[in-house]
Amino acid sequence: HYTLQQAILLQSLATWLALNIKLHLQVQEMAVLASADELTGTFNRREFVQESNQTMQHFSHTRVPFTIGILDIDHFKQLNDCYGHTAGDHVLKKMTKKIKDILREGDFLARIGGEEFAIILPACLGDEAMRVFKRICSTIEAMEVHYEQEVLCFTVSIGVAEVGKHDADAEDVFKRADKALYCAKQAGRNRIHFAN
């Protein structure tokens, strides 16, 4: 049997615990929202920067290499202008799902802006990385995204860079992948360009 004072104390403790659990769950939910792209459900740019820095630190300690790919939908502005932003959003969601299906466990996908995505392939270089990116390109090129009465087809360009001995940080690898993306676009789009 509890005294009235003990019962009040237990009730207060139970209320305090319930509030703390609720607060903890809300903090966890906020952390997920802060790291996720709302439209596609992938990680966002902030999370990409954090993940690429951690991957670079891991490389510095273990020498386990990695590859970064920057993917951009070709002529996405025209797709948005012609069919509307809702159609563009639909394309982004469908494409993201296809890419997730292709990537290996442990690979990292983030939407870093508009129609641009970043992919980190840990412990993956050269021909193996090229196979992953070729599969992404060919899968997307073969996609038919149905939107209202329209069938939308599109392609992507990808710039790729492997971590190298001269890279001081993850930003260096990212910049080389971004330049490679620009080269892929300049060379006619719907292609992959590996940075030197």
Region annotations inferred by a language model:
Residues 108-111, 152:
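A short pre-motif secondary-structure segment
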Residues 2-22:
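Amphipathic alpha-helical "output/dimerization" segments
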Residues 77, 92, 98-100, 110, ...:
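Short beta-strand->loop micro-motif that forms the acidic, two-metal-ion catalytic signature
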Residues 130, 134, 148, 163-195:
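Catalytic-core segments of nucleotide cyclases and related cyclic-nucleotide turnover enzymes
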Residues 51-83, 99, 110:
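Active-site-proximal structural segments of metal-dependent nucleotidyl cyclase/transferase enzymes
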Residues 87-108, 116, 135, 140:
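Active-site-proximal alpha-helical element of nucleotidyl cyclase-like catalytic domains
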Residues 31-50, 71-85, 93:
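Conserved nucleotide-binding and Mg2+-coordinating catalytic segments in signaling enzymes
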Residues 30, 48-55, 117-118:
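Hydrophobic scaffolding residues in well-structured cytosolic catalytic/regulatory domains
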